[in-house]
């Protein structure tokens, strides 16, 4: 048996040592790389995501309900002032301050309401940048200042600037906080909370006409309007004191969502709302003057038709909103549009004070839903919830065109036959509301 040469053993040993050294280096390299692996996984699995998501809305509690009170006061001094314009229309028609046609006078209220919607469209991005307090202060100042200037006005142009533009711009600054703050504090109870806040517009539409009617005799027009300005000042201090922006959007919303124009249900509902507001504002502007001019009632009672209508609308803005949480807003707003159209047409047959009061009560209830439900409808039509602010602003901006046209168009129809074409006015208001209801039923 032959023995292996000793050098073979030395070669094998050297090879084994080389292999062991390579294994050691490989193992050392592997071990050295292991601590880095979790870091690589962490950096790829957890990229920076920006600020943490805000907690869900509390849906109650002292702070949340204080914001409902603040929202109530905002609606009290925005839509509440708009709803009271019918009393100013009746007073201006008397010629005590200036002599102008019904259509010219209605431009004051129409511009005021249009400014509310259009300025609200542009101030949405300011709100998104976190300037809630600035909007509240500027809007409150414009409303109070506008009324103080209105108390000094003697001509149509002065009234148009003070009441139409100044008060309207102030209301527009407050409109976005009206509809944007509460959804950050309520989700499951949003309809109820928003309905309670929106009822402030009805309360304003009751109190402001009564104040003007009761004080204009003993104090005159100037001091009566100043008292309205002081009431606005006191009530607007409440939202300035209690309202805070709970959630600041990560970035300011775009002014226009171009995809909305190809969204057929959204555009159909916007068109329907535009037509509904045309008919509704014809009713709000002229029902008081109708009672005095026919004459169905005396002048004093004619002033109270607007507060009666707005008192009923308080229930129309709360009950349907609360029901919308259960059965959906579209199942309510469509029949309300149809009901308003029928009631406006019923004014063609009204010849007694009792009949006029009944129409005012019923149209106030169903008309209140036409103002309270659209924000919920726009929310329901927006699939991408990050675009809610944009879509609400766009929708109300387009609806503002109907508000702008509604009153003056009705005034032009009325003035066609020496301020007596009431048949044409009520047919115009009734048909536009009926068409709006049918569009919602068919297309949305």
Swiss-Prot record:
> Entry's PROSITE patterns?
MFS
Q: Where is the composition biased (Polar residues)?
A: 1-13
Phenotype upon loss of function: Strongly reduces the production of yellow pigmentation.
UniProt keyword terms in alphabetical order = Cell membrane, Glycoprotein, Membrane, Transmembrane, Transmembrane helix, Transport
Q: Where is this region: Disordered?
A: 1-57
Q: Locations of Basic and acidic residues compositional bias?
A: 31-44
The membrane topology term of the UniProt record is:
Multi-pass membrane protein
Please name the Pfam families in this protein's record.
MFS_1 (PF07690)
Q: Which segments cross the bilayer?
A: 62-82, 107-127, 134-154, 159-179, 192-212, 223-243, 267-287, 301-323, 330-350, 356-376, 394-414, 424-444
Q: Per the entry, what induces it?
A: Deletion of the conserved eukaryotic csnE deneddylase subunit of the COP9 signalosome leading to defect in protein degradation results in the activation of the silenced dba gene cluster. Expression is positively regulated by the dba cluster specific transcription factor dbaA. Expression is also controlled by the transcription factor flbB.
One GO MF term: transmembrane transporter activity
UniProt lists compositionally biased (Pro residues) regions at: 48-57
What the entry lists under InterPro entries is as follows: MFS (IPR011701), MFS_dom (IPR020846), MFS_trans_sf (IPR036259), Proton-linked_MCT (IPR050327)
Its cellular-component GO annotations read: plasma membrane
Compartment list: Cell membrane
Q: Where are the annotated glycans? A: 8, 421
Q: What does this protein do?
A: MFS-type transporter; part of the gene cluster that mediates the biosynthesis of the antibiotic 2,4- dihydroxy-3-methyl-6-(2-oxopropyl)benzaldehyde (DHMBA) and its derivatives. Is probably involved in the transport of the metabolites to the environment.
Family, per entry: Belongs to the major facilitator superfamily. Monocarboxylate porter (TC 2.A.1.13) family.
This protein is called MFS-type transporter dbaD
From which organism does this entry originate?
Emericella nidulans (strain FGSC A4 / ATCC 38163 / CBS 112.46 / NRRL 194 / M139)
Query: In the UniProt record, what gene is named as encoding this protein?
Result: dbaD
């Amino acid at each position: 048996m032959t023995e292996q040469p000793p050098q073979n053993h030395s070669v094998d040993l050297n090879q084994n040592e080389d292999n062991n050294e390579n294994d050691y280096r490989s193992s050392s390299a592997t071990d050295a790389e292991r601590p880095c692996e979790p870091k690589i996984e962490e950096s790829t699995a957890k990229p920076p995501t920006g600020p943490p998501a805000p907690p869900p809305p509390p849906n109650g509690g002292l702070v949340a309900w204080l914001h409902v009170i603040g929202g109530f006061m905002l609606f009290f001094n925005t839509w509440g002032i708009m709803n009271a314009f019918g009393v100013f229309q009746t007073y201006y028609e008397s010629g005590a301050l200036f002599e102008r046609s019904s259509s010219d006078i209605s431009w004051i209220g129409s511009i005021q309401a249009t400014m509310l919607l259009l300025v609200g469209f542009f101030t949405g991005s300011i709100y998104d940048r976190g300037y809630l307090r600035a909007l509240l202060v500027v809007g409150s100042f414009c409303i109070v200042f506008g009324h103080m200037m209105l108390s000094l006005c003697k001509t149509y142009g002065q009234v148009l600037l003070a009441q139409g533009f100044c008060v309207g711009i102030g209301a527009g600054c407050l409109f976005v906080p009206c509809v944007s703050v509460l959804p950050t504090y309520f989700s499951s109870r949003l309809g109820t909370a928003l309905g309670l806040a929106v009822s402030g517009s009805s309360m304003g539409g009751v109190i402001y006409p009564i104040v003007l009617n009761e004080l204009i005799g003993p104090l005159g027009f100037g001091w009566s309007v100043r008292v309205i300005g002081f009431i606005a000042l006191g009530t607007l201090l409440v939202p300035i004191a209690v309202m805070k922006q709970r959630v600041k959007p990560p970035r300011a919303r775009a002014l226009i969502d171009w995809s909305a124009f190809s969204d057929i249900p959204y555009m159909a509902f916007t068109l329907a709302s535009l037509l509904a507001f045309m008919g509704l504002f014809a009713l709000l502007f002229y029902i008081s003057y109708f009672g005095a001019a026919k004459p169905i009632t005396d002048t004093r009672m004619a002033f109270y038709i607007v507060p009666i209508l707005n008192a009923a609308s308080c229930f129309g803005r709360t009950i349907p909103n609360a029901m919308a949480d259960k059965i959906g807003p579209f199942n309510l707003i469509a029949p309300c549009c149809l009901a308003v159209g029928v009631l406006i047409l019923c004014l063609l047959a009204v010849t007694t004070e009792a009949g006029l009061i009944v129409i005012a009560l019923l149209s106030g209830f169903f008309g209140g839903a036409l103002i309270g439900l659209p924000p919920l409808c726009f929310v329901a039509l927006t699939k991408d919830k990050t675009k809610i602010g944009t879509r609400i602003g766009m929708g109300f901006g387009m609806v503002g065109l109907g508000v702008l046209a509604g009153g003056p168009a009705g005034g032009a129809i009325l003035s066609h036959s020496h301020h007596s074409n009431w048949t044409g006015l009520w047919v115009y208001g009734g048909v536009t509301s009926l068409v709006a209801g049918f569009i919602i039923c068919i297309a949305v």
